[in-house]
Amino acid sequence: MNPENPPPYPGPGPTAPYPPYPQQPMGPMGPMGAPPPQGYPYPPPQGYPYQGYPQYGWQGGPQEPPKTTVYVVEDQRRDDLGPSTCLTACWTALCCCCLWDMLT
């Protein structure tokens, strides 16, 4: 078998799963198939939500609801009750004794 000249495909051949899209007419047409109104040469933006309603805070429209501030606090647990805890307590007592001695 020659890779540059394969044998013909037996059968009707592969078909596409969907029919092709029809071609859209080109020209000065509006989004609904009619020419745009006078003084409005461009169609409105396609992604605008709720056509006819202003966004939050625009021209007296509804105000955006207040946002709630959330603070995340992590509780630190120290389960290493050992030499470091004892050392911290000793240093605290020594400092307190030194301060007491200086003040009296």
Swiss-Prot record:
InterPro entries: CYSTM1-like (IPR043240). It is a single-pass membrane protein. GO terms for cellular component: membrane. Disulfide bonds: none annotated. Signal peptide: none annotated. This is Cysteine-rich and transmembrane domain-containing protein 1. Residues 1-25, 33-47 have a biased composition (Pro residues). The keyword Cell cycle does not apply. Keywords: Membrane, Transmembrane, Transmembrane helix. Belongs to the CYSTM1 family. The chain crosses the membrane at residues 81-98. It is found in: Membrane. Its main location: membrane. Residues 1-47 are annotated as: Disordered.
